[in-house]
């Protein structure tokens, strides 16, 4: 695990360390990019929540393994100047954020230096480290999933508590965009009046450019009274309402189909399609990818893991020809619809499982001189073998998982590429998530 903020003078000691106990006083000596703090107890490494370097804390053990342990600081005996008072009253019980107790500039510096240190280890040539791509740290999420459960005979709606299955009830969330946050107390009131509360699964909310969309997952059939109450609420709040009783059946009850706009393009999406949840950072990320691709009218560009066309369509506004490839068939259908409404005729979308060989696919027989990769957390390892056969001169890799990026970057370097430049994207402030964009060239 990447570690930063190690204090040279800090003693890596712990009091009462003859054995690991459920409650123990320890001295913290370093901080990793996910906001977990590191201490040594009996020679074993412990990762501790809610602690900072140079602090002395009283910990409670969460779990202990042979090689490491996890704990949480329940009481701060000696505080660090890096600590701040969390602005959310539900922190740290709520599992939505993990780093609100750390000053924002320290969060970002920790992530950036840990990422740079790990990536630079892969090659001897210096990497051009670009400034962090960042934005506001509050009200940045345009999408969320809310858990629902009966607790103490009452229906609770919110996020799951860290390290438990309990749900923390929320009437406000400063991470969600305001139009979604204002719905929280109204939803609590609405579903408290339901007759069939045990039929409820979870709620998904999306703040699209044209509407607020809500999907309600339920088990079994909803009675007429509950459905009528839900429909009236959706109409009163001007929501696009969807019901889902299983993965293969989504019912659209009212409201417009959601879309968002980027670079003058309108991208429609289905309620469960993947979209980037931080709209301002998505715009900055797309623009940075366009800049690093250095697109000309002669370029033929391949976009792997293209989704509904978030990168592909803006690229097609400048390139000679673009091919977008995605594994999820429904998202490919949506990408084709977005292509038709955009009026762009220099782009084609294909459905292909990128975890399997694609050398026999028609699109893979075409020449491409540049490639954009935007894989899920699993990374793009398998498709790299086949991608190398296309010999692109430039690859832009968007990553949401540093571990799989390091693995994939190592393979690209073995195939003759080098990392020319890279930047951290602070897509999810106050959390341990780390996104990045990197450029590989021959």
UniProtKB/Swiss-Prot annotation:
Pfam families from the UniProt entry: TRAM, tRNA_U5-meth_tr
Active site: 400 (nucleophile)
UniProt: [4Fe-4S] cluster binding residues: 88, 94, 97, 173
InterPro entries, alphabetized: 23S_rRNA_MeTrfase_RlmD, MeTrfase_TrmA_AS, MeTrfase_TrmA_CS, NA-bd_OB-fold, SAM-dependent_MTases_sf, TRAM_dom, U5_MeTrfase_fam
E.C. code: 2.1.1.190
Keywords of this entry: 4Fe-4S, Iron, Iron-sulfur, Metal-binding, Methyltransferase, rRNA processing, S-adenosyl-L-methionine, Transferase
Residues annotated to bind S-adenosyl-L-methionine: 276, 305, 310, 326, 353, 374
GO molecular function terms attached to this record: 4 iron, 4 sulfur cluster binding; iron ion binding; RNA binding; rRNA (uridine-C5-)-methyltransferase activity
GO biological process, one term: rRNA base methylation
Sequence ranges assigned to domain TRAM in this UniProt record: 10-75
Reaction equation(s) it catalyzes: uridine(1939) in 23S rRNA + S-adenosyl-L-methionine = 5-methyluridine(1939) in 23S rRNA + S-adenosyl-L-homocysteine + H(+)
Disulfide bonds: none
Function: Catalyzes the formation of 5-methyl-uridine at position 1939 (m5U1939) in 23S rRNA.
PANTHER family: 23S RRNA (URACIL(1939)-C(5))-METHYLTRANSFERASE RLMD (PTHR11061:SF49), RNA M5U METHYLTRANSFERASE (PTHR11061)
Membership in a protein family: Belongs to the class I-like SAM-binding methyltransferase superfamily. RNA M5U methyltransferase family. RlmD subfamily.
Protein name: 23S rRNA (uracil(1939)-C(5))-methyltransferase RlmD
């Amino acid at each position: 695990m990447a570690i930063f903020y190690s204090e040279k003078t800090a003693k890596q000691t712990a009091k009462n360390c003859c054995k690991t106990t459920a409650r123990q006083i320890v001295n913290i000596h370093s901080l990793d990019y996910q906001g977990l703090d590191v201490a040594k107890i009996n020679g074993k490494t412990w990762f501790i929540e809610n602690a900072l370097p140079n602090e002395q804390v009283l910990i409670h053990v969460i779990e202990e393994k042979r090689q490491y342990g996890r704990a949480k600081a329940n009481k701060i005996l000696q505080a660090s100047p890096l600590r701040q008072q969390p602005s959310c009253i539900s922190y740290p019980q709520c599992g939505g954020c993990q780093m609100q107790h750390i000053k924002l500039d320290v969060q970002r510096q920790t992530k950036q230096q840990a990422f740079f240190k790990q990536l630079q280890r892969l090659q001897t040539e210096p990497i051009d480290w670009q400034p962090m791509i960042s934005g506001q740290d509050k009200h940045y999420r345009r999408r969320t999933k809310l858990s629902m459960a009966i607790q103490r005979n009452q229906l609770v709606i919110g996020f799951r508590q860290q390290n438990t299955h309990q749900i923390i009830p929320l009437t406000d969330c400063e991470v969600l965009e305001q139009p979604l946050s204002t719905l929280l107390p109204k939803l609590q009131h609405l579903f408290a009046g339901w007759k069939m509360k045990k039929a409820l699964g979870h709620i998904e909310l999306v703040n699209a450019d044209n509407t607020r969309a809500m999907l309600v997952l339920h088990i079994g059939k909803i009675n007429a009274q509950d459905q009528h109450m839900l429909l009236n609420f959706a109409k009163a709040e001007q929501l696009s309402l969807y019901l889902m009783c299983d993965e293969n059946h989504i019912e659209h009850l009212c409201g417009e189909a959601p879309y968002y706009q980027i670079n003058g393009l309108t991208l429609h999406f289905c309620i469960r399609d993947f979209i980037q949840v931080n709209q301002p950072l998505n715009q900055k990320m797309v623009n940075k990818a366009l800049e690093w691709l250095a697109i000309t009218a002669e370029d033929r560009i391949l976009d792997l893991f293209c989704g509904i066309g978030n990168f592909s369509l803006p690229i097609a506004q400048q390139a000679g020809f673009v091919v977008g490839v995605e594994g999820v068939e429904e998202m490919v259908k949506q990408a084709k619809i977005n292509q038709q409404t955009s009026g762009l005729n220099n782009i084609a979308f294909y459905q292909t499982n990128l975890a399997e060989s694609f050398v026999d696919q028609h699109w893979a027989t075409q020449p491409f001189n540049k490639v954009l990769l935007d894989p899920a957390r699993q990374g793009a390892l398998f498709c790299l073998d086949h991608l190398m056969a296309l010999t692109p001169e430039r690859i832009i890799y968007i990553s949401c998982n540093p571990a799989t990026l390091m693995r994939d970057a190592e393979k690209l370097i073995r195939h003759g590429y080098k990392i020319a430049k890279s930047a951290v994207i602070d897509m999810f402030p106050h959390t341990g998530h780390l996104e990045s964009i990197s450029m590989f060239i021959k």
